[in-house]
From Swiss-Prot:
Protein's name in the database: Ribonuclease P protein component 4
Lineage: Archaea, Methanobacteriati, Methanobacteriota, Methanomada group, Methanobacteria
Catalysed reactions listed for this entry: Endonucleolytic cleavage of RNA, removing 5'-extranucleotides from tRNA precursor
Major localisation: cytoplasm
EC number: 3.1.26.5
Gene responsible for this protein: rnp4
GO CC terms, sorted: cytoplasm; ribonuclease P complex
Source organism: Methanosphaera stadtmanae (strain ATCC 43021 / DSM 3091 / JCM 11832 / MCB-3)
Length: 104
């Protein structure tokens, strides 16, 4: 017997909450970085509970290793080399490499 599917309005509310939490994390990062880290953790909890994937533009804004909110220049180092984007978290040292191609 399969599990019952959640109504669509629940997923809509969960996405709205996740968006609000990420916006708050961006606003609070300069004054209270620990608060923005908590918002990221809450967003990931909502995402896993309701089985909603995070949109691509949010996936690069936090470290998957230490759950910290990442802002380039303050706790994230971004390097471009050999068709890869290297993103290094300066909190835990985790390195993520993403391939890219140049557009003409």
């Amino acid at each position: 017997m399969s599990r019952r599917k959640r109504p669509n309005w629940i997923n809509t509310i969960a996405l709205e909450r996740m968006q609000i939490l990420f916006e708050q994390a961006e606003k609070e990062f300069s004054k209270h970085p620990e608060r923005s880290d908590r918002y990221v953790k809450l967003t990931r909890n909502i995402s896993t509970k309701y089985n909603i994937p995070l949109p691509n533009y949010w996936r690069g804004r936090f470290c998957k290793n230490c759950n910290k909110f990442l802002k380039p220049g303050s706790n994230l180092r971004v390097r471009l080399s050999n068709n890869t984007i290297s993103r290094k978290c300066l909190e835990c040292g985790d390195l993520k490499k993403v391939p890219y191609t140049k557009k003409n």
